[in-house]
Amino acid sequence: MSLPHLSLADARNLHLAAQGLLNKPRRRASLEDIPATISRMSLLQIDTINIVARSPYLVLFSRLGNYPAQWLDESLARGELMEYWAHEACFMPRSDFRLIRHRMLAPEKMGWKYKDAWMQEHEAEIAQLIQHIHDKGPVRSADFEHPRKGASGWWEWKPHKRHLEGLFTAGKVMVIEWRNFQRVYDLTHRVMPDWDDERDLVSQTEAEIIMLDNSARSLGIFREQWLADYYRLKRPALAAWREARAEQQQIIAVHVEKLGNLWVHD
C-alpha cells in the first residue's frame, strides 16, 4: 500500500502548526497563555543567551506576540510551571513532575549535572544547607556568597552554588521563582506537598512512553529517531511505541517530498 504523499510545504506547515507558529495570534496574549503555550511545546529550553532578550522570552513572543516578560516568571511562581533537566534545563508544566521524578531519584545517571563525589564529600555542609532552607525558607546561591575572580582569571564560586545545583538535580529542592535572573530554591516537599513517591511515582518505562507521546504531538511530523532527543531519552522503547501508536492510529506514516518517509501525529 502506498503512503499518503505530502509536499515539503505541507510538512513544514504541520510542524509549524504543532509548535504554534503557523498563524499570527488572533488576540492579545493573557497570563494563562504562558503555561498553555509551553504545554503545547511540552517544554521550553532555558538559554541565557541575551542579545535582544533572553531566549525563552523570544520563543514565547514568536507564538504570542507582545506580552509582559514577567509573565513567564509569574507562571513559575504561581506553580503552573516547573524547571528541570528535560532537553536541557527547561520550563515545563508542573503537572509533568511525574515524568521526570525518576531522574531526580537516580541523579548519578545525570552525567555532568550531578557529581556524587562532591555531594558525599560535602555531606555535612549540604545537610546544614537543607536545614537552613527548612528553617529560614527559600534561598538563592547569592544569599551565601559572592563570586570572586581566581588566579586563573575565571570566576570562582563558593560551595553553596554547587550544593544547590546538586540538590536540584537530585530533586531535593526545586526552583520556585527567578529573582533578578537568579534561581530561588525551596525544599521539594514544600513545593509539591501532595506528592508521594510510593503512591505517585511513574516508572521510567511508563514516563518515557508519555514523553514520546508528548514529543510526537509537539513536533507534529517527525522521523522516529527525532523523538528521543526531545527529552534526551537514552534508550527508549521506540519500536514498541511506534507499533502501538500506529495500530491505534495516533501516528500515520506518510511520504514527504524530498524527505522520504515520516510520521504524522494525528
PLM regions and their residue ranges:
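Long, low-complexity intrinsically disordered regions
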Residues: M1-D266
